[in-house]
A protein has these predicted regions:
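Transmembrane-helix signature of 12-pass secondary carriers
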Residues: 2-489
């Protein structure tokens, strides 16, 4: 899943003497053909094993807490308005909606290449603990300013965790999963995460009106997000590092040891020797990574991702962040608007499930384009819906299409760069979507107040149309192709 220059030569048994023979080879494990095989070829053709499935599960649960944090404020926003006496036109309310996204942008700028420097595993674990801690502190906020600060700091960790944590997760999954199963298994991880979206909606519906032991219900919803740190403590010792990242750092023995864990879990033997590398393997500094991104074909791909991430947040986070405010602007009370949004959010895991069979059957670029245009169409229908049934119906269709889109593009963007620059490329461009998402309340709320929901979703649709055209013109084809084919340099 990597460029050819990252496939390591040398003997695969650098550490073999330290391991029992059965652990190295497996008594009944069938060997894979070793003639001329690179380490990348071996990983691409390996059957899915127990460790692959474990990593998919770990990534999915980690992303669960990430999605919980992102959609949190949209579900408790009405309760926060009542708690702090904020109107939807007030700067403080806009900052509450935007603060986590602004933090994500800062996190990306400061930590966007973190995973390329310290590894996929360490970046994932570190940042999950970070944003869990500030989520817990935010639950004890004494005023709106303190909550804004905590949401900002949470956002820094949330971006770093995706690299924010999604860009770590995207890289991790892209690098370890066999090419024929890459899309389907990655979609299972994302599907697990999206269960958090309706869950936080229904938790808010239940807890927002309550005081439990004198504690406001919305504070409990915030505090539950901190459980991600507990999860880290439970899994960190079993989570492997990406062999491809280790190869990119020139850590031959460590790469082979990590790969051996995947091979043992899949019941196959590692070859005695891999084909030699195209070039020496060593860590790449920031200047070298930037230089590679300026070369063909990555220059056009990087430009595509810049435009893509500047505008895609209008659809995905524009709806997720502001849908509750749109419903409330039509005269529904806090409970009713929270109920409608919680029901609409059921579409997120449904859409993610639908993407699983689609990702390997439909060219991923085509799937991204079709789904983002569907988001635009369903969002407009949501804006013009005149009764509660249609509001919920088109809300579900919008969120469903959103997650077909999200799963497809997360797999897609991780495939179109080699491993040594993957986190840097995705992290730096993804940061743009965070700052745009942070600005959305300041851009779209005035449109909603002055011109109505139709104008607001019309603005969103124009942005998504530009994304679709850019993908069609600049995006490469990737489905059922190896990383060496996709990334020739």
């Amino acid at each position: 899943m990597n460029s050819q220059s990252l496939d390591l030569g040398g003997r695969a048994d650098d550490r073999a003497s330290a391991l029992p023979c059965a652990a190295r080879t497996g008594a009944d494990a069938p060997p894979l053909s070793a003639h001329g095989v690179t380490l990348g070829d071996f990983m691409d053709d390996m059957p899915v094993g127990a460790l692959h499935r474990f990593v998919v599960w770990v990534i999915g649960i980690g992303l669960f807490f990430d999605m919980y944090e992102i959609f949190l404020v949209s579900t408790i926003g009405s309760a926060l308005q009542n708690e702090y006496g904020l109107s939807r036109q007030s700067t403080d309310f806009k900052l509450l909606l935007a603060s986590a996204f602004i933090g994500m942008f800062v996190g990306a700028m400061c930590l966007g290449s973190l995973a390329d420097r310290i590894g996929r595993r360490n970046a994932f674990l570190l940042t999950l603990v970070w944003y869990s801690a500030f989520s817990l502190i935010g639950a004890f906020s004494v005023n709106a300013d303190m909550l804004v600060a905590c949401r900002f700091l949470t956002g820094i960790g949330v971006f770093a965790a995706r690299y924010r944590y999604y860009p770590v997760a995207d890289s991790f999954l892209s690098e370890i999963l066999p090419k024929d199963k890459r899309g389907r298994l990655a979609a299972w991880a994302y599907t697990t995460s999206y269960v958090a979206v309706p869950l936080v909606g229904f938790l808010a519906l239940w807890l927002n009106p309550l005081h439990v032991g004198g504690v406001a219900g919305w504070r409990i919803v915030l505090a539950l997000g901190s459980l991600g740190a507990v999860y880290v403590l439970l899994v960190q010792h079993r989570l492997p590092e990406s062999p491809r990242w280790l190869l990119a750092q020139g850590r031959t023995a460590d790469a082979h040891a990590a790969l051996r864990r995947f091979a043992d879990g899949a019941g196959v033997r590692m070859p005695e020797q891999f084909a030699p590398p195209a070039e020496p393997q060593r860590p790449h500094g920031l200047r070298e990574r930037i230089a590679l991104l300026r070369r063909r074909p990555y220059r056009a791909r990087y430009l595509m991702l810049v435009i893509f991430h500047l505008l895609q947040g209008f659809g995905y986070y524009g709806f997720g962040t502001l849908a509750g405010t749109v419903v409330k602007s039509r005269g529904f009370d806090v409970t009713d608007s929270t109920l409608f949004i919680a029901l609409s959010f059921v579409g997120y895991p449904i859409g993610s499930l639908l993407s699983i069979p689609l990702l390997n059957r439909i060219e991923r670029r085509t799937l991204v384009i079709a789904s983002i245009l569907s988001v635009a169409a369903f969002g407009l229908c949501f804006a013009y819906s005149g009764n509660t049934v249609l509001i919920v119906c088109f809300g579900v269709l919008t969120t469903c299409a959103s997650n077909v889109f999200s799963n497809a593009y997360h797999v897609y963007q991780a495939e179109i760069f080699p491993a040594r620059v993957r986190s840097t490329a995705i992290g730096s461009t993804y940061a743009l979507s965070r700052i745009v998402s942070g600005a959305l309340p300041f851009v779209l709320l005035p449109v909603l107040v002055d011109y109505g929901a139709g104008a607001m979703f019309g603005t969103i649709s124009v942005a998504l149309g530009i994304v679709a055209v850019t993908l069609r013109v600049l995006g490469p084809l990737t489905t059922r192709r190896s990383q060496d084919e996709i990334n020739p340099v």
